[in-house]
């Protein structure tokens, strides 16, 4: 495996790496289906100008280093990684406000971090050169 670079380890977080919200692609797809169903006639009250904006996320932030460690643990592997310089413009913490989709559509993600890590690893093993290669 190539070397994974974690950009920055000097942020004001518990382990020095950025914090982000991670979500499984299956949860995203299910959220998209719920939003697309809004465009049915009976849901006009939730639409403004045939437009609806919803953020999706788990409402839980994980540091980049926590993700790497979770990936290693979930899959029983050791990743080859190093810390690089910060990227210009990276926010210390980036978490979406998902209250609208939780409230209006009763959508919540169902797949946790450990399963996300396992599914990602299995996908990469099945498609080492990418999905369409």
Go through each PLM region and give its residues.
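C-terminal substrate-binding subdomain of Rossmann-fold SDR/epimerase-dehydratase oxidoreductases
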Residues: 1-133
């Amino acid at each position: 495996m190539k070397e994974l670079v974690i950009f920055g380890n000097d942020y004001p977080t518990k382990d020095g790496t950025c914090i982000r919200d991670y979500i499984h692609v299956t949860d995203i797809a299910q959220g998209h289906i719920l939003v697309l169903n809004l465009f049915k006639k009976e849901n006009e009250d939730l639409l403004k100008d045939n437009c609806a904006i919803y953020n999706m996320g788990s409402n839980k932030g994980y540091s980049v280093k926590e993700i790497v460690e979770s990936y290693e643990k979930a899959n029983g592997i050791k990743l080859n990684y190093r810390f690089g310089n910060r990227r210009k413009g990276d926010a210390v913490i980036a978490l979406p406000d998902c209250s609208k989709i939780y409230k209006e559509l009763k959508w919540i993600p169902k797949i946790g971090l450990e399963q996300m890590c396992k599914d990602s690893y299995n996908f990469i093993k099945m498609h080492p050169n990418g999905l369409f290669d």
